[in-house]
Amino acid sequence: MGMRVDIVTLFPEMCQQVLDASILGRAAKRGYIETHCHQIRDYTLNKQKQTDDYPYGGGCGMVLYAQPIADCLRAVQQEVAAQGRPAPHIVFLTAGGQRYTEEHARRLAQYDNLTLVCGHYEGIDERVIDAFADEEISIGDYILTGGELASLVVADSVLRLKPGVLAEQKGYEEESYLSLIHISEPTRH
């Protein structure tokens, strides 16, 4: 069984399309990794499938409800357990999270299961973060419209470290980020 990555998002089609393409897509087809994207709206309890509301204390923007995210995470945990896997390591992608580095990628690659939760709008109700997060990560000091791109950055950087994903295992060990000096790399043709 390869590493499993789940992404909890309002835009699962967007994320799955990227994960199914290129190197990660080939690795998934060969069974080296497994990726799943989950629609938060599928877990709402209202007819409108609304996932957000105004912040309790006022202020601008909308905040994602805790309930549908919590229910989605419970469903992911049950699905992972049904496969006989250990509980997933749950990471929330937030602007206030710890700055993501290659060291994080290498550490996260040690888990069998990783669940990435994408924020959107003004953020996520803090209660669900407090209840489920093993950690919070930010990919940089800038704001995106949602956590989908951040989750894909994390997923790609972690999954490429897993055996069988890259054609040559040495590929990830000899990348230019490991050296302070970067040389020009022309093609052979």
Regions found by a protein language model. Name each.
Residues G2-D42:
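Glycine-rich, flexible N-terminal cofactor/catalytic loop recognition
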Residues Q39-Q50, D134:
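Short, hydrophobic/aliphatic alpha-helical segments
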Residues I181-H189:
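Conserved small/polar residues in nucleotide/adenosyl-binding loops
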Residues D6-V8, H36-H38, V91, L114-T115, ...:
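Hydrophobic/aromatic beta-strand patches that form the interior of the parallel beta-sheet core
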Residues Y65-H120:
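S-adenosyl-L-methionine/SAH cofactor-binding core of RNA-modifying enzymes
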Residues C15, L24-G25, T51-P55, V76, ...:
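N-terminal targeting/anchoring "stem" of glycan-biosynthesis enzymes
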Residues T51-C72:
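Short, structured active-site "lid" loops
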Residues I124, V128-Y177:
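Structured adenosyl-cofactor binding patch, chiefly the S-adenosyl-L-methionine
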